[in-house]
Amino acid sequence: MEQQRISFVIPCYASENSVALVIQEIRDTVAQRPEYDYEIVAVNDCSPDNVLEVLKAEVAADPKVKVLDLAKNGGRHCALMAGYHVTTGDYVACLDDDCQCPMDRFWDLMAPVEHGEADVAIAKYVKKKESGIKNLGSWVNDVGSTWLLGKPKDLHFSNFAVMRRFVRDQVIKYQNPYPYVSGLMFQASSRVVNVVMEDRERTIGQGHYTLRKSLSLLTNAFTSFSIKPLRLAIYVGCLCALIGFIYGIWTIVHRLLHPMVMAGYSSMMAVLLFLGGMIMILLGIIGEYIGRIYIRINNAPQFVVRQSFNVEQAPSVEVQ
């Protein structure tokens, strides 16, 4: 019987002390199931430390390890897209480079996909062992994804997931320079499930995911997958117009009933500031969409590969 292959994609950034441990844990985990072959695609996301040399040593020691070295830091999701382009497995898994993803539970994560019950399985952590800022960012992304993508409220995204080959094939068709991989997986199939598990404490290095990055990721989600913010702008504009109309009628009636009362300067300024602020916010939303359309038209790349190791055919320098 021909072995099925699992491709593991690891975005790497500032992880010279942990990524080799993650790779070894993958080897040990797959060794438990000899009916599966595997490959490991590690993507150096322009890391400032010595992680590339660590990965090159892994390539020299193990032909199943592939490495992409990106010329510019584009973030985790761009690194994942680069890695997905060179995977050859029947199943594609993604995990972090910091030893926090519980690889000892990988076969539990794999089970619903392996048995045909789902096309994508994502780890759902009971309580994430992260900083309050990162947890807040995760919560913001979860709420935003539920509203923008139509994601069920009880479905949670995380960095530890596995998907079928056809889902990966659909994901890499996306050419926008601002990918949101979790949304792309959910867009490719509605058969997405969570597998409950507990993540590990961080024992090596420190996290680099900030609230700002979470908000940036949410912006990628709503400008790439939904026009709801534009519709919201219409609703807010109509509401402001209605409030202004009612206020205008009230002002006229009040003036007729109380002709000696001077018009209130402070209330007028408050209304002007409110409406001016709303107009700027709505123009900002529209501008964000237009700006990304402009960038897309100019063929801005998702990622740029400086060099690759043990990869038969590296992805195009610019994904177009």
Where are these regions (language model features)?
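Short conserved micro-motifs on helix faces and helix-strand junctions that flank
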Residues: 11, 70-72, 116, 161, ...
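Solvent-exposed polar/charged
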Residues: 60, 85, 111, 138, ...
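Structured catalytic core of nucleotide-sugar glycosyltransferases
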Residues: 1-131, 144, 319
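Residues in soluble alpha-helical coiled-coils and helical-bundle/repeat scaffolds
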Residues: 14-17, 100, 104, 172, ...
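Hydrophobic helical membrane-anchoring modules
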Residues: 2, 180-320
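Acceptor/aglycone-binding surface of glycosyltransferases and processive sugar-polymer synthases
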Residues: 70-72, 76-86, 91, 103-179, ...
